[in-house]
């Protein structure tokens, strides 16, 4: 189960990525990171860029294309079947922390995410201040503040 400590640890990374399909919720989370002046890379295999408030930001097709994966925390906004592949790649690359938005995980995803040594921080599930569980849009500022980034 995620805690304030796991959320805080997520935000200790110097780099961030948002992995998901090009949908409103993915764009909203990416914009949230930009609004908070965090170094964020959008990850989307189907789009070369994303536009936020009239400015284009280049995407990368997968986590392997991130410049510093071992220093990057990743927000995941995908269907559970897709999340499994994202987690497998993240684990292989040594990504330290993941934040799985509500609706992105099931039992098989949690088994992989919570496997011993897979990640140093996994934020997911019940808790946080939102009614659907831990959400970076709802709980991110508090965790950033606790990590000294606000």
Which functions belong to the PLM regions below?
Residues 36-38, 93-98, 116-120:
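A short helix->loop->beta-strand "cap" motif at the edges of active sites that frequently abuts
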Residues 102-140:
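Rossmann-fold NAD(P)-binding glycine/threonine-rich loop
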Residues 22-25, 29-52:
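NAD(P)-binding Rossmann-fold cofactor-contacting core
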Residues 15, 72-73, 97:
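Structural motif
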Residues 82-99:
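Rossmann-fold NAD(P) dinucleotide-binding segment
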């Amino acid at each position: 189960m995620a805690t304030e400590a796991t959320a805080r640890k997520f935000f200790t990374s110097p780099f961030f990525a948002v992995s998901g399909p090009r949908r409103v919720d993915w764009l909203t989370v990416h914009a949230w990171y930009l609004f908070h002046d965090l170094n964020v890379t959008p990850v989307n295999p189907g789009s070369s860029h994303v536009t936020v408030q009239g400015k284009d930001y280049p995407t990368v097709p997968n986590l392997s294309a991130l410049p510093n994966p071992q220093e990057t925390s990743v927000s995941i906004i995908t269907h559970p079947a897709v999340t499994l592949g994202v987690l497998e790649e993240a684990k292989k690359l040594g990504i330290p922390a993941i934040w799985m938005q509500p609706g992105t995980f099931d039992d098989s995803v949690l088994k992989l995410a919570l496997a011993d040594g897979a990640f140093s921080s996994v934020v997911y599930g019940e808790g946080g201040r939102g009614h659907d569980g831990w959400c970076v849009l709802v709980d991110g500022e508090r965790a950033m503040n606790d990590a000294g980034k606000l």
